[in-house]
A protein has these predicted regions:
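Glycine-/small-residue-enriched transmembrane alpha-helix faces in small-molecule transporters
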Residues: 1-36, 73, 81, 143-173, ...
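Hydrophobic alpha-helical transmembrane segments of multi-pass integral membrane proteins
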Residues: 6-10, 36-51, 121-134, 151-159, ...
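Hydrophobic/small/kink-forming positions within alpha-helical transmembrane segments
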Residues: 16-19, 23, 50, 72, ...
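Specific transmembrane alpha-helical segments of multi-pass solute transporters/efflux pumps
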Residues: 17, 21-22, 50-98, 134, ...
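Membrane-interface helix termini and inter-helical loops of multi-pass transporters
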Residues: 23-31, 84-87, 136-150, 199-217, ...
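Helix-helix packing/entry segments at the starts of transmembrane helices
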Residues: 38-40, 94-101, 170-193, 221-261
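C-terminal transmembrane-helix exit sites in multi-pass transporters
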Residues: 48-58, 101-126, 253-273
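Hydrophobic transmembrane alpha-helices of multi-pass small-molecule transport proteins
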Residues: 49, 69, 117-139, 161, ...
Length: 310
């Protein structure tokens, strides 16, 4: 088996794991509060990454520390919004809304860094925001733009997409100037510390040590964070960026399929159309928009905690 084929297969498996864990976490949240869950998973992930990349840590510079701190803050915010929102929304909607982070990156780059947006990216953004409206805003025959009745979990997940978009931007910049092993460990450690500090302030922590809680913690910490970092760092050396974007866009699809099979979730015609528009917008922006412009100072956003990524 060639390295390229092996890399493609590994990236598909990572994306599948990310998609499946939306349902795994949703199930576990019946027995554990969301912020406590985040803390446990991220502490375990940080310990695993620190052990795996131990030989790279003694040479961390102050500049790398600052970069890891910034990326870790947005990683923390993204996870907190995502997991808290998942308590109140469905796995499929959470996955598609989290995927908006990819679309928000060029928007924020245009606003904050004066980056030009080409027509393909603009079309992708427009399609994704149209899908966002259909997916989150309940139908109201009296008022076309009525925002009443929006699920609070959907709003929290939108906050997650915003945070992950900034995490992608700052991670990409950090990856051009610092060793990815050091940044990977630092962002996980920073997120873990902030999560632990937030728990007593923002919720009344509670856990029933059931099998589904333990399974969710192990899967998300070891496979979807620690192992995923390592796999991405290796696999994307042998995978064209357009192939990577296409593979990662399957995450919400895997989440929806898992939720449909395991939980019987059905999006309905309106929400399904919204999800399709979001997915189409992401693909248009990533496959056509990225191909139409050269690489920028933002750099490769890898290894990262994905769209998503739960």
């Amino acid at each position: 088996m060639s390295r390229s084929l092996k890399a493609h297969i590994l990236l598909v498996l990572v994306t599948l794991a990310w998609g499946v864990t939306f349902v795994v976490i949703k199930d576990a949240l019946q027995d554990i509060t969301p912020l406590l869950f985040n803390t446990l998973r991220m502490v375990l992930a940080a310990l695993c990454l620190a052990a795996f990349y131990a030989r790279h840590l003694p040479r961390i510079s102050r500049a790398t520390l600052r970069a890891g701190l910034l990326v870790g803050i947005f990683l923390w915010l993204g996870y907190e919004f995502q997991t808290t929102g998942l308590v109140l929304t469905t796995p499929s909607k959470s996955a598609f809304l989290t995927g908006l982070s990819v679309i928000l990156v060029p928007v924020f780059l245009a606003i904050g860094w004066r980056r030009m947006v080409n027509r393909w990216t603009a079309a992708g953004v427009a399609a994704a925001f149209a899908g966002l409206y259909l997916l989150t805003v309940p139908a109201d025959g009296r008022r076309l733009l009525s925002l009443e009745g929006i699920n609070r979990g959907d709003l929290l997940t939108l906050g997650c997409a915003v945070a992950f978009a900034f995490q992608i931007i700052f991670l990409g910049r950090a990856m051009r100037a610092h060793h990815y092993q050091q940044v990977a460990v630092l962002q996980a450690v920073v997120a873990a510390v902030l999560m632990a500090a937030t728990v007593p302030l923002a919720e009344h922590p509670h856990v029933v040590w059931s099998g589904r809680v333990l399974w969710a913690i192990v899967v998300t910490a070891l496979f979807c964070t620690a192992a995923a970092f390592t796999i991405q760092a290796w696999a994307q050396q042998f995978t064209p960026p357009t192939h990577t974007a296409l593979i990662f866009s399957l995450e919400p699809v895997f989440a929806w399929l898992t939720s449909y099979v395991v939980m019987g979730e059905r999006l309905g015609m309106r929400a399904g159309l919204g999800a399709a528009l979001i997915l189409g917008g992401v693909l248009l922006s990533e496959l056509k928009g990225s191909a139409a412009q050269p690489a920028t100072e933002v750099g490769p956003a890898l290894p990262e905690v994905s769209s998503d990524e739960v």
